[in-house]
Amino acid sequence: MATGNVIQVIGAVVDVEFPQDAVPKVYNALEVENGAAKLVLEVEQQLGGGVVRCIAMGSSDGLRRGLKVTDLERAIEVPVGKATLGRIMNVLGEPVDMKGDIGEEERWSIHRPAPSYEELASSQDLLETGIKVIDLMCPFAKGGKVGLFGGAGVGKTVNMMELIRNIAIEHSGYSVFAGVGERTREGNDFYHEMTDSNVIDKVSLVYGQMNEPPGNRLRVALTGLTMAEKFRDEGRDVLLFIDNIYRYTLAGTEVSALLGRMPSAVGYQPTLAEEMGVLQERITSTKTGSITSVQAVYVPADDLTDPSPATTFAHLDATVVLSRQIASLGIYPAVDPLDSTSRQLDPLVVGQEHYDVARGVQSILQRYQELKDIIAILGMDELSEDDKLVVSRARKIQRFLSQPFFVAEVFTGSPGKYVALKDTIRGFKGIMDGEYDHLPEQAFYMVGSIDEAVEKGKKL
């Protein structure tokens, strides 16, 4: 193995000089010996003259010029397979949960080609989530990609935790969770939530949190994806959760600036679309198995046209948009039913009844949105009888779109509810047809199925 020496350290970027005839390849892993501590670097650029520029996969504190560096002659490799289930690992696949070695039988490189055209397969099967607003308005496809878009504090992580809990309990497959640049507290909460729900032995956890160097946050999504690919290639249906894809982009921006590339729009890296494509093209289903991915996407300043969320949109099958206006009404999950979309919402896929109910709900809510200005200026009394009925039903639908979550029981004090798709369709169809016009609005707030709303209405 070739050895070189550190010649420059600038934060997370380290320049290493090797002999001219043994320059490491781009993406090779290098190991720096700094006393007892070992730091892994990843080669990003070859500068000529035997010098390579690398990104540190850990803190570069204590590094100095002249330290010996060994070329491992391979990319970063991480453990894959069943040994990773129930464990928490970092970007290098090292355990961070104090439970000893992973004991894996196989390690895979985190840089892998996307499946070829012949290997790809698409599915029309729906994945029931038990969350009314998602199942009705933006149904998920098995083996599809879903984005949860939202600004700060509107509930992306809570929605994702509820999805993981529901799917892990109702659908007995394996899941991989990649925490990319999120809060360590959330990672901790998530681990305990999974343990309490008895689904931890079906989930592999990979964390690269907010306080870690940009190299970790840029590569940790690939580490999680590699573990998911292994399960898929064994012929399984895997779930891959990434929280948060925006931090992946942001880490790329930091690395790009440190490597001296010229920034593009809004200061993002010039390779934004390519970096996103490299990750997203690997998250796909093949003829062997499927990867269904749910990705949380932070929307900077609630602006969906920002280059980062805009680049992510192109890769998704379904988008769940969380809205601050809906959250401010106290309706959780704060999903915007008029802004969320899904390719699966097609009568040929979901069936005519589901399609008609979803579109009917949207048209009632859209009409209510248009009438809001008139109500604000002139009041309800100025509306026609038909419009009054539309407003009354729209307000019931809006409240019925709320739902108590299992993972939020500690905050809401009410037990979580899982609602089957057929019950969801029956409930909204009934409200639209006027079967529940006699019930007060409050009866529909924070309940599961329509039967619970009727029961609640009797008590009010």
From Swiss-Prot:
The UniProt family comment states: Belongs to the ATPase alpha/beta chains family.
Question: Membrane topology per the record?
Answer: Peripheral membrane protein
Cross-referenced PANTHER family, in alphabetical order? ATP SYNTHASE, ATP SYNTHASE SUBUNIT BETA, MITOCHONDRIAL
Any idea what job this protein has? Produces ATP from ADP in the presence of a proton gradient across the membrane. The catalytic sites are hosted primarily by the beta subunits.
SMART domains named among the record's database cross-references: AAA (SM00382)
Q: What NCBIfam families does the entry give?
A: atpD (TIGR01039)
The domain of life is: Bacteria
Q: For this protein, what reaction is catalysed?
A: ATP + H2O + 4 H(+)(in) = ADP + phosphate + 5 H(+)(out)
Q: Does the keyword Cell cycle apply?
A: no
Subunit-structure text: F-type ATPases have 2 components, CF(1) - the catalytic core - and CF(0) - the membrane proton channel. CF(1) has five subunits: alpha(3), beta(3), gamma(1), delta(1), epsilon(1). CF(0) has three main subunits: a(1), b(2) and c(9-12). The alpha and beta chains form an alternating ring which encloses part of the gamma chain. CF(1) is attached to CF(0) by a central stalk formed by the gamma and epsilon chains, while a peripheral stalk is formed by the delta and b chains.
Annotated Gene3D superfamilies: 2.40.10.170, Bovine Mitochondrial F1-atpase, Atp Synthase Beta Chain, Chain D, domain 3, P-loop containing nucleotide triphosphate hydrolases
Q: Name one Pfam family in it.
A: ATP-synt_ab
State what protein this is by name.
ATP synthase subunit beta
Task: List the source organism.
Answer: Sodalis glossinidius (strain morsitans)
Which gene name does the record give?
atpD
